[in-house]
């Protein structure tokens, strides 16, 4: 859920990035519009990718694309075609992640039942919701602290170099760090390979 809340927090920080780094706060609507359209369209192709490559690999692909998209935006220099490319890449990445994340959560419920004999949908879903809220809370707190340390002044005509750096840290580098952590965690996720056998065993028990 940390990955999901990191993605959510990115949207909160976009206004700072668009206004002070890209130089036009109105770019937020363009960035979000392209991102959302691509993400929605991408959802229609995820089932096909999951069938061929598995949930873990598609989710990991989404994280990699999110990282690439953030880096492309970071080095866009406000050049609109590159910003569009970044939004497309991140839209595809979020489609991969959003479509597979909850499916993997559902798989862990089946795994828990197979391992312990108890099916705990409520507990698992509550834990996910709690983790999402905690992640959002931490992200919002970090945003305020880092901007304050960087000397960000909301109504300033121009921000200092340290303030601009703090915005980049919040909008680009912290989400990238979370995505990298997600990739590391996925290295230890092997349920895709075992899941058919687990479902067959559960069916046999019932």
What function would you assign to each model-found segment?
Residues 42-55:
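Helix-to-loop junctions at the C-terminal end of transmembrane segments
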Residues 1-7, 11:
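Single conserved hydrophobic/aromatic residue that forms the stacking wall/gate
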Residues 145-177:
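A membrane-interface helix-boundary motif in multi-pass transporters
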Residues 189-206:
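Intrinsic disorder in cytosolic terminal tails and internal cytosolic loops
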């Amino acid at each position: 859920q940390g990955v999901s809340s990191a993605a959510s927090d990115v949207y909160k920080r976009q206004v700072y990035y668009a206004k002070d780094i890209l130089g036009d706060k109105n770019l937020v609507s363009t960035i979000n519009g392209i991102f959302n359209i691509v993400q929605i369209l991408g959802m229609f192709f995820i089932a096909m990718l999951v069938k061929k490559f598995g949930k873990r690999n598609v989710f990991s692909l989404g994280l990699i694309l999110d990282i690439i998209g953030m880096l492309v935006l970071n080095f866009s220099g406000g050049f609109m075609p590159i910003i569009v490319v970044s939004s497309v890449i991140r839209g595809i990445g979020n489609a991969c992640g959003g479509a597979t994340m909850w499916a993997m959560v559902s798989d862990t419920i089946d795994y828990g039942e197979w391992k312990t004999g108890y099916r705990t949908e409520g507990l698992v879903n509550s834990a996910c919701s709690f983790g999402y809220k905690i992640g959002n809370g931490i992200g919002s707190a970090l945003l305020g602290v880092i901007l304050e340390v960087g000397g960000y002044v909301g109504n300033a005509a121009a921000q200092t170099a340290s303030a601009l750096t703090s915005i980049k840290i919040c909008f680009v580098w912290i989400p990238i760090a979370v995505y990298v952590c997600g990739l590391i965690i996925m290295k230890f996720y092997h349920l895709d390979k075992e899941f058919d056998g687990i479902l067959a065993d559960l069916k046999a028990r019932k």
